[in-house]
Amino acid sequence: MKKTAIAIAVALAGFATVAQAAPKDNTWYAGAKLGWSQYHDTGFIHNDGPTHENQLGAGAFGGYQVNPYVGFEMGYDWLGRMPYKGDNTNGAYKAQGVQLTAKLGYPITDDLDVYTRLGGMVWRADTKSNVPGGASTKDHDTGVSPVFAGGIEYAITPEIATRLEYQWTNNIGDANTIGTRPDNGLLSVGVSYRFGQQEAAPVVAPAPAPAPEVQTKHFTLKSDVLFNFNKSTLKPEGQQALDQLYSQLSNLDPKDGSVVVLGFTDRIGSDAYNQGLSEKRAQSVVDYLISKGIPSDKISARGMGESNPVTGNTCDNVKPRAALIDCLAPDRRVEIEVKGVKDVVTQPQA
């Protein structure tokens, strides 16, 4: 009884500290153990010689980890063959069994746990006896006994763990059947492999798409290419020039931007006349670009009259009308300002 109490105390000592190196939740593990098996209370009926109580023990086990604190194990234990010798009787006793236990653990550090196992073992015990005169008898017995164990477990890697454990099993056998009813203490070192411990690859959020780039471009077209002198109707050559311009505007995606068409005249004529002519010419360009596909709410016309001449005073001394008209040709122009959105395309990383 005293030895049983000590074994239980060792098993429950695992809960006096803090810790965990248990496998991940809801995963399986399997392992093996090897150690020192010692039988207790081994008095054989009619035995008159020494009994070799210390033997080699071994086992294999598998388990399921529910969470960091609770798991279940099933295992096979070979508790060793214990010979005894005497003047009148000699023989051997051996025991083995299958156990099922609940494993209760508590983490001390990230890599180290203490634990206890509580459950039962279905065992088989066999004896062989030789008596004077050469007679030999063999007997066996089966039964169920409680199992108590306590130990520490250290995770070498997430998959590989080692354990040091002391296990106690009560009353393995029936003295009336096989001549003895020993207890067993097994001090063992074990190693286990844990399945499903690999960390899932981190999900890398895709980089946000770069903000669309707003571009502003200016185009200047000579009015003499677009219109006849003093007229606001587009010439065929002017339509061709606007067709080429439209292909460039499309690349800027004016649907997401705006287009402003500015009409300019030279200084020949009155201010009012030139203002009206510049407005008509700008509107003619707008109407044509709308017909090509630019939304009407994204484009506007503005007449600038004879303001902002580009010739400056270079034509001040030119007197003949025809020569003056030629000299002032750069002032007769249509300027187009486009603000458009262009998507920024990033190349994927290799």
From Swiss-Prot:
Keywords: Cell outer membrane, Conjugation, Disulfide bond, Ion transport, Membrane, Porin, Repeat, Signal, Transmembrane, Transmembrane beta strand, Transport. Residues 214-342 form the OmpA-like domain. Sequence repeats lie at residues 205-206, 207-208, 209-210, 211-212. Disulfide bonds join 315-327. It comes from the Bacteria. Gene3D superfamilies: 2.40.160.20, OmpA-like domain. GO terms for cellular component: cell outer membrane; pore complex. Residues 205-212 are annotated as: 4 X 2 AA tandem repeats of A-P. SUPFAM superfamilies: OMPA-like, OmpA-like. Residues 1-21 form the signal peptide. CDD domains: OmpA_C-like (cd07185). The record marks 73, 163 as: Part of salt bridge gating mechanism. The chain crosses the membrane at residues 27-37, 55-66, 70-78, 96-107, 112-120, 146-155, 160-167, 186-194. It is a multi-pass membrane protein. One of its GO terms (molecular function) is porin activity. It is found in: Cell outer membrane. Belongs to the outer membrane OOP (TC 1.B.6) superfamily. OmpA family. With TolR probably plays a role in maintaining the position of the peptidoglycan cell wall in the periplasm. Acts as a porin with low permeability that allows slow penetration of small solutes; an internal gate slows down solute passage. Required for conjugation with F-type plasmids; probably serves as the mating receptor on recipient cells. The extracellular loops are most variable in sequence, and in some bacteria confer sensitivity to phage and/or colicins. Monomer and homodimer. This is Outer membrane protein A. The gene is ompA.
